[in-house]
UniProtKB/Swiss-Prot annotation:
Catalyses which reaction(s): D-ribose(out) + ATP + H2O = D-ribose(in) + ADP + phosphate + H(+); D-galactose(out) + ATP + H2O = D-galactose(in) + ADP + phosphate + H(+)
Name of the top EC class for this enzyme: translocase
Function: Part of an ABC transporter complex involved in carbohydrate import. Could be involved in ribose, galactose and/or methyl galactoside import. Responsible for energy coupling to the transport system.
Subcellular location: Cell inner membrane
Binding-site list for ATP: 53-60
Residue span, ABC transporter domain: 21-256, 267-512
Protein EC: 7.5.2.11, 7.5.2.7
Protein name: Putative ribose/galactose/methyl galactoside import ATP-binding protein 3
Length: 514
């Protein structure tokens, strides 16, 4: 995926080395947490500057201060050579600082043009000047090479196209500083190449980009400098060409990670927990057959559209299959809903943990007990809140969930700790079969290692684990066997010890024999 680029620090203009943004001594406190402790950062025109750190390192808080969503408790922000104190995101945006969040901030039922000019529509008298708005939107989206009509509803666009709409929206505000939060997390390789092309063009126009990503390997293609944060502190800032990925990882976690994956302690038995035969959803997948053994981690590999998530959802009862059988512990079962699947000991950890795995406004304690409320209820049906707190504290300690208290709202936790809460929820339920769907997407290397360790511990305790992942090294590092899918069909089941990325991709592309 390599592409032509400027050398580190080399933008297209003489102004490239001119500082556009500087932060000095930034501190930010929340109840029970010092989120930022004396952070310093500078950003130059025409520069792509990566900010790296584990979840909880302070990246999101720092970006929210720069973009006007938070005020710092201490320290100074200088923008274009003058001290600033933005009191809202709209103030920062008006000054030329825009942020593109990982969860895109668009209105699906509105058109591209309406999203670009929401709350600032051009007017002719008391009426919106739709013709002018569409014309201006067309110019904005043409600048970034987005080939859609400005009247197209945003909801019908792909994630990559929606992200380009967000970039066009920022440019319509004449953004000179653009913050990109995990911009490639939901993109295909081809879409990532397109995004990097746009970033190169923005850099050439003198736009300064703060780039947040856990995908360190892709940074070499576009990043000029990299700043590492840890526990709310500034650790280092370097030209990207002067440091290795191992250096960055070691600074992020405060130690060297000799192995990306833990030494496996689990050994699968011959006891079959889940036996799926000829399962199908017409037009979606199948027929598919496989078995999951006690203590096994079974991988699901495949390209986008291969049907991996759809198969898991059908087994979990979220989608109704059109045929096939499911047996648990040797006994046929009929699963018509997630409630029935949960009762049978099956859990599904969705790839979208925020929408489908957590109740974000609720505290950690309530989320941990959500799947097994009866476990903390009296015989009269009343919740015993002291028991809920005891259960939550046990899992917070056992899973090393970083939170100021079990009363903290789960939306305030980092992505890795949110994922641990989801796992804890199913552990408290006593689930014996767990489907992990992209469990490490959007979390840092240290949190990934912790999640891997939990998965192996579950398998060692006799749980059957299915790992759905788009990361082939993850599948090779964590599984016993790998089932490969292509367009809804299983093309192979491979012994992980005796396969390779090349063989997996061979079958994932639909070929039957390596």
């Amino acid at each position: 995926m390599a592409m032509p680029r400027n050398l580190p620090g080399q933008a297209a203009h003489d102004e490239a080395d001119q500082e556009i943004l500087r932060l000095d001594g930034i501190r930010k406190r929340f109840p029970g947490v010092l989120a930022l402790d004396g952070i310093r950062l500078d950003l130059r025109r025409g520069e792509v500057h990566a900010v790296c750190g584990e979840n909880g390192a302070g990246k999101s808080t720092l970006m929210k201060i720069i973009s006007g969503q938070y005020l710092p408790d201490e320290g100074a922000v200088h923008y274009r050579g003058a001290p600033v104190r933005f009191r809202s995101a709209s103030e920062a945006q008006a000054a030329g600082i825009s942020i593109i969040h990982q969860e895109l901030n668009l209105v699906p039922h509105l058109s591209v043009a309406e999203n670009l000019f929401l709350a600032r529509e051009p007017r002719r008298g008391p009426f919106v000047d739709t013709k002018r708005m569409n014309a201006e939107a067309a110019r904005c989206i043409a600048r970034i090479g987005l080939n859609v009509a400005p009247t197209t509803k945003v909801g019908v666009l792909s994630i990559a196209q929606q992200q380009m709409v967000e970039i066009a929206k920022a440019l319509s505000h004449d953004a000179r500083v653009l913050i990109m939060d995990e911009p490639t997390s939901s993109l295909t390789e081809a879409e990532t190449v397109q995004l990097f092309r746009i970033i190169e063009e923005l850099r050439a126009d003198g736009v300064a980009i703060l780039y947040i990503s856990h995908r360190l390997d892709e940074m070499a293609q576009i990043v000029d400098r990299v700043t590492v944060l840890r526990d709310g502190r500034h650790i280092s800032t370097d030209d990207f060409a002067d440091v290795s990925i191992d250096d960055i990882v070691a600074r992020m976690v405060g130690r060297t990670l000799d192995d990306a994956y833990p030494s496996r302690q689990s050994v699968p038995t011959d006891d079959v927990l889940l036996d799926v035969r000829d399962l199908r959803r017409d037009g979606v997948f199948g027929p598919v057959s496989f078995a999951l053994r006690r203590g096994e981690i079974l991988g699901f590999a495949g390209l986008m559209g291969a049907g991996r998530t759809e198969i898991a959802r059908a087994i979990f009862g979220a989608d109704r299959p059109d045929g096939g059988t499911i047996a648990l512990h040797g006994r046929p079962v009929t699963i018509r809903s997630p409630r029935e699947a949960i009762r049978h000991g099956i859990a599904y950890l969705s790839e979208d943990r925020k929408k489908e795995g957590l109740a974000l406004p609720m505290p950690v304690a309530a989320n941990l007990t959500l799947a097994n409320v009866r476990g903390i209820a009296s015989r009269f049906g009343f919740l015993r809140f002291d028991d809920e707190i005891d259960v939550a504290r046990r899992y917070v300690q056992d899973l090393a969930i970083r939170t100021p208290s079990v009363h903290q709202r789960v939306r305030n936790l980092s992505g890795g700790n949110q994922q641990k809460v989801v796992i804890g929820k199913w552990l408290y339920r006593g689930s014996k079969i767990l489907f992990f769907d992209e469990p490490t997407r959007g979390i840092d290397v240290g949190a990934k290692f912790a999640i891997y360790g939990l998965m192996d511990r579950l398998a060692a305790d006799g749980v059957g684990v299915v790992l759905i992942s788009s990361e082939l090294p993850e599948l090779l590092g964590m599984t016993d066997r790998i089932a490969v899918f292509h367009e809804g069909r299983m093309t192979a089941i491979l012994d992980t010890k005796h396969t390779s990325q090349e063989e997996i991709m061979h079958y994932a592309s639909g070929r039957s024999h390596a």
